[in-house]
Amino acid sequence: MKVVYHGDQKKHYPGQFLVNGRFRPNPELPERMDRLLDGAKAAGCVPETPENHGMAPIGAIHSAVYLEFLEHANERWKRIDGAADAVTPNVHPDRREVGYPASVVAQAGYHMADAAAPVSDHSWTSICWSAWTAVHAAELILDGADSAYALCRPPGHHAFNDMAGGFCYLNNSAIAAQVLRRAHGRVAILDVDLHHGNGTQSIFYSRNDVFTVSIHADPLRFYPFFWGYSNERGEGAGQG
């Protein structure tokens, strides 16, 4: 089996994140990818470098205004006197339908579910290569491979159509599933993780062509807290 990854995924350095009211060192560091890659190689996986697949497969899942924010937020943030090193929200709207704000500070709150997905100098580069890694692995399957391992960093299952969170920015599995839809009528995403894949669920909640299953700890006590309950069964065409 091939393991797909790109070295530029290591450029993203989130620094710290807010947990239990305190800023702590972010565990989603570049070294995490090294350990996963070493494990994949030890298991016999053959490394393959992905191509730049452009913005079309990413834009098929994520909104244009959100992608614009992710790409340019850091350079806009740096113009603020006394701002932190990375884009980090400090206010969140209780009603997102009231309109789209102009300030990058307000946009950070609009597009970030929490303070665990900061955007720093090289984040956008790594974010894109992580998504292209998922696209490339999906293309390998479409070309006839039985399986492929997309080593995606940053991860993606907490990323919504227009919102980051939980170390995630672009929803890599959702992007890959959409690519696979070119040749398959229905696709399934099985998400096994301590935390519920709330972003993935949200993206396909009203669709019947991608089936999402998340096996996770009880959100009554575990992040993401507000999603992942047994009564969440989809809506409209996606209800089941």
Where are these regions (language model features)?
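HDAC/HDAC-like amidohydrolase catalytic core signature
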Residues: 1-190, 195-240
